[in-house]
Amino acid sequence: MKLAYWMYAGPAHIGTLRVASSFRNVHAIMHAPLGDDYFNVMRSMLERERDFTPVTASVVDRHVLARGSRDKVVSNISRKGEEQRPDLIVLTPTCTSSILQEDLQNFVDRASLYSESDVILADVNHYRVNELQASDKTLEQIVRYYLDRARKEGIFNRSLTDVPSANIIGILTLGFHNQHDCRELKRLLGELGVSINQIIPEGEFLNNLKDLPRAWFNIVPYREIGLMAASFLEKEYGMPYISTTPIGISNTADFVMQVEKLMNFWATVLLGKKFHYDQYVENQTKFVSQAAWFSKSIDCQNLAGKEAVVFGDATHAASITKILSGEMGIRVSCSGTYCKHDAGWFNEQVQGLCDEVIITEDHTEVGDTIARIEPSAIFGTQMERHIGKRIDIPCGVISSPVHIQNFPLGYRPFMGYEGTNQISDLIYNSFNLGMEDHLLDVFGGHDTKGISTKSLSTGGKSIDWTPEAESELKRIPGFVRGKVKKNTEVFARQNNILKITVDVMYAAKERRSIESLA
């Protein structure tokens, strides 16, 4: 176990609660001490929903430690069953309460005798999996539970829908632009002639899960959640699924072609016709998406030779790397993800598209990599935005974890052809425009930022700048000022210099010139 003040993926119980609170009329009981019950506040703040978060904390306090938890947990489950009348109550411990090693399945079995609601214990190992893995497992557990029961009760309908249809698996609360992506995905599928059978877990009733196998195929937009449920449906009911994420021109085209392939598997038999989407892809790429022609414009060509670092969850980091390298001609110096459990897939996706790959959950390692590379822009999470501010490198946020700024009220999808426009804007606006900085530096204006003397590393001694050195640094054009400042501070640390003067600046410049000629 490692102590950290920042985690890219939260603890396992957060993943379970995200899934439970995404379904309609499902309540979650969290067996946890005070301090682990922040999910309600976090979801209420970020999602800005009118409804209360359907999560209750069964608090582990000194009385519980003295007498045991069973009576309290069973009482809370029964009480919530009477008050809320949910279809399902999900009981989950947290990492902290798991230390007590209580038989929570026994609590669930006992509570089921008194509650009219279904009661299950989240089948998650809280010591071995993180938020993303737990959400994937919990969704699969709920889908399996209700499909198995429907089959036993004889209310199971396996017949396919009359028109082509798909299930979208993995849209849930607190996801990165999930609601916007879902709207865009529904629009894209509608234009392809595919109706939506079900979207799970977001906004779906559990009673409808028995109709999941009626769809022609499943779609898993994000690898982080939905793959286990889709694999279960494929294994048990022969339902194929698409796991290609339609982010970017090339990925969206691949996605549409996979939809065509799965549609025609049944369409020739049930409808007596075939679907062809080649012309649709061409029209969307040329006339609907602005990203294709923008990537050939002089504005985008100005980004040629710029370096970028990408870091985030596996789905978004891989997709953005493909867009930067393959579609916009930007050099990706480093691409990485914190999804260590999906490292194999990620390496395969970004192979040949970046100079190096980093797979880590340690934000300090990511920060040191960024400081070493000194890219023109960063594309990452909320933490990479903090890192960028400290070393004066702009950052575009492309992945969870994020704060409230990245739960926009306006329509901001990342998926589909409209998503390509949004991503192109994000990428272009994330880079500092050299001439703009230079003109502001010459003529003045709103750019009144002081010179930051903070270093990324918190372990070394701080380096001070003399007023004369700061004045000299301000005379350097803005688009290279950050790099000059960084190189000077590196030179000072290497030579144990704690105060940077004008002479030190020129000495650092001379050293840099010699190294570049060597």
UniProtKB/Swiss-Prot annotation:
Substrate binds at residues 434-435. Keywords: 4Fe-4S, ATP-binding, Chlorophyll biosynthesis, Chloroplast, Iron, Iron-sulfur, Metal-binding, Nucleotide-binding, Oxidoreductase, Photosynthesis, Plastid. One of its GO terms (cellular component) is chloroplast. The active site is at 299 (proton donor). One of its GO terms (biological process) is light-independent chlorophyll biosynthetic process. Signal peptide: none annotated. Its EC number is 1.3.7.7. Coiled coil: none annotated. It is found in: Plastid, Chloroplast. Its main location: plastid. GO terms for molecular function: 4 iron, 4 sulfur cluster binding; ATP binding; metal ion binding; oxidoreductase activity, acting on iron-sulfur proteins as donors; oxidoreductase activity, acting on the CH-CH group of donors, iron-sulfur protein as acceptor. Its cofactor is [4Fe-4S] cluster. Binds 1 [4Fe-4S] cluster per heterodimer. The cluster is bound at the heterodimer interface by residues from both subunits. The keyword Chloroplast applies. [4Fe-4S] cluster binds at residue 36. Pathway: Porphyrin-containing compound metabolism; chlorophyll biosynthesis (light-independent). It comes from the Eukaryota. It is an enzyme of class 1 (oxidoreductase). It catalyses: chlorophyllide a + oxidized 2[4Fe-4S]-[ferredoxin] + 2 ADP + 2 phosphate = protochlorophyllide a + reduced 2[4Fe-4S]-[ferredoxin] + 2 ATP + 2 H2O. Belongs to the ChlB/BchB/BchZ family. Protochlorophyllide reductase is composed of three subunits; ChlL, ChlN and ChlB. Forms a heterotetramer of two ChlB and two ChlN subunits. Component of the dark-operative protochlorophyllide reductase (DPOR) that uses Mg-ATP and reduced ferredoxin to reduce ring D of protochlorophyllide (Pchlide) to form chlorophyllide a (Chlide). This reaction is light-independent. The NB-protein (ChlN-ChlB) is the catalytic component of the complex. HAMAP family: ChlB_BchB (MF_00353). This is Light-independent protochlorophyllide reductase subunit B. It comes from Adiantum capillus-veneris (Maidenhair fern). The lineage of its organism: Eukaryota, Viridiplantae, Streptophyta, Embryophyta, Tracheophyta.
